[in-house]
Amino acid sequence: LEYKLQIKRTPCRVEIILKESEFKMRYELFKRLNTGGEGLSRQEIRNCIFRGLDSRYSEFIAELAQNDIFREIVNISVSNEEKMYYEELVLRYLTLKNKGTRYSQANIQDYMDDYLESQCKEFDDTQIETDKTLFVNIMKILEKLKDENIFKLGKRYFTTSMYDAIMLSLSENMIDLEELNIEQLGKKIAILKEDDNFNKYVGSA
């Protein structure tokens, strides 16, 4: 009886979200409701919210995240895969490549949110094909390097800073890379990883 009375006396807050409600308001409310129990990852929230805006860009991200070479090199845990970390890494790369590496938001997650929202609102088929071709070509190059630790700091753990540096460098220099043999590229990456300034940046990021 005591518990029943407590339940009856506990206020229940109701939030009404209309279809025409401002998008950011709906997104913020969804994030706030995602508390207690096992919360969703940021990418899982994006997958729920932004598909309601336009599902095509999320489907494009999911397609790239299924790339066999990409998954073999990144090689995350099952739990992280379930939290859509492959998709988050693809979105991270596309955001930094297409929107730049400098951002005014509090953190890169907010920056990625803004980028994904903009792509959903202004879907560009031509840009999609360009990004897809480039991503696939980068993966083919990485496969030829035969380095399963390429995104790792030493041989210890995957680091997003190493991932960002290598993915963005390859995407910005693809034309030059076509004339560079794989052995030379591997040596250049190895030299980069041994650079003290680079390691200082990667280790602190």
Protein language model features and the residues they cover:
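C-terminal hydrophobic structural anchor segments
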Residues: 143-197
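Basic- and aromatic-enriched surface patches that contact anionic nucleotides/nucleic acids
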Residues: 1-113, 179, 183-191, 197-204
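An acidic intrinsically disordered interaction segment
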Residues: 48-66, 121-140
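Generic recognition of stable, solvent-exposed alpha-helical segments in well-folded globular domains
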Residues: 24, 85-88, 133, 137, ...
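Short amphipathic alpha-helical segments and their helix-coil junctions
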Residues: 62-79, 135-153
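Small-residue-rich helix-loop
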Residues: 105-139, 145-151, 155, 162
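Conserved phosphate/pyrophosphate-binding and hydrolysis machinery centered on Walker-type P-loop NTPases
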Residues: 79-83, 128, 156
